[in-house]
């Protein structure tokens, strides 16, 4: 009897179709680890009851895939073994077999971000894992983008990232152990700024690659960031993350329309923070970010650019009337004549 070959789908976008050629869920359920040491993420992702973690799509993992996921998730959280963590990140970026684990990795990242807001190393690891997942050329991520954005946006706009002044991780720096906080209450630990900046860069990358296939993606991100920036009850760290994201995602047009018209009102927030020793450093970071935003806006003018304002000191009142006295003083101090001209020529009533 001659041998023949028949083609069938093992998986479609990471989901195993229910056809006779593929094993059924009931046949594969016995492969899942059981007992108190079983991985809850795998159990939830495969449809077992009594677990709160819900996958994006339920399908069966082979025993090898289960073991791979367990090793990856363990390595990502092991901040004491950098070599192992780097190996996991390399696997996520380059291994074609990761596609089968995409749903579980995204769920894992989202859950860890949600429950580890006070743990900077975990947040950093989750952002790195997201970055490597985006860089894997063998994975079709378009359907997953709406689920990947929220944890990254949380790292960008989160109210408090890192330990509080009354709490420090076992491997915390001496600065944190001496009572420094990460979000502007007490002396400042700046690690959370790097987390927010990395998250903003990831959102920029996501928008560049996937905004065409995910309608309204850029608009939703920008709306969330603008709302956070205009909420003056939010901490300065949130304002910083919002500014970084708006600058990277919307570019010069977003700065001109969303940020520039609100700087005069924001001047009061800056004045109050600069007068507070515990928040002064954070306020200076935000001022520096605002200047970068204005530089980007000015550079985008292209051929419209001129020599700038000749007498900056003489234009201080006009500048302050548009962007507030703190930003105006920084523009004059840094001799940003072209930026001053771009601001003075901007029609804020049309923004």
Predicted regions: what is each one?
Residues 45-166, 211-213, 246-258, 264-271, ...:
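Alpha-helical solenoid scaffolds in large eukaryotic transport, assembly, and signaling factors
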């Amino acid at each position: 009897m001659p041998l023949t070959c028949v083609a069938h789908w093992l998986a479609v976008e990471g989901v195993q179709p229910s056809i006779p050629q593929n094993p059924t869920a009931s046949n594969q359920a016995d492969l899942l680890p059981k007992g108190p040491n079983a991985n809850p993420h795998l159990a939830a992702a495969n449809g077992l009851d009594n677990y709160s973690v819900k996958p994006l799509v339920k399908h069966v993992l082979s025993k090898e895939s289960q073991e791979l996921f367990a090793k990856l998730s363990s390595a990502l959280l092991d901040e004491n073994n950098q070599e192992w963590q780097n190996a996991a990140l390399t696997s996520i970026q380059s291994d074609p077999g990761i596609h089968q684990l995409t749903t579980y990795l995204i769920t894992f990242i989202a859950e860890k971000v949600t429950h580890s807001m006070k743990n900077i190393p975990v947040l950093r690891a989750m952002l790195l894992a997201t970055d490597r997942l985006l860089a894997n050329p063998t994975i079709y991520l378009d359907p997953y983008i709406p689920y990947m954005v929220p944890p990254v946006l949380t790292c960008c706009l989160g109210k408090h990232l890192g330990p509080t002044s009354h709490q420090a991780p076992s491997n915390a720096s001496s600065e944190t152990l001496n009572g420094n906080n990460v979000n502007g209450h007490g002396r400042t630990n700046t690690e959370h700024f790097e987390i927010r900046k990395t998250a903003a860069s990831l959102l920029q990358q996501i928008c560049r690659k996937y905004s065409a296939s995910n309608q309204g993606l850029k608009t939703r991100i920008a709306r969330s960031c603008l709302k956070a920036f205009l909420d003056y009850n939010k901490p300065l760290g949130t304002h910083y993350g919002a500014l970084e994201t708006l600058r990277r995602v919307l570019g010069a047009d977003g700065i001109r329309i969303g940020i520039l018209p609100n700087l005069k009102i924001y001047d009061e927030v800056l004045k109050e923070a600069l007068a507070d020793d515990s928040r002064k450093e954070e306020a200076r970071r935000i001022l520096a970010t605002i200047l970068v935003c204005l530089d980007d806006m000015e550079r985008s003018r292209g051929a419209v650019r001129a020599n700038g304002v000749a007498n900056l000191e003489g234009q201080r009142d006009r500048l302050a009337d548009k962007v507030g006295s703190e930003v105006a003083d920084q523009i004059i101090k840094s001799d940003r004549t072209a930026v001053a001209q771009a601001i003075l020529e901007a029609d804020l009533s049309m923004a």
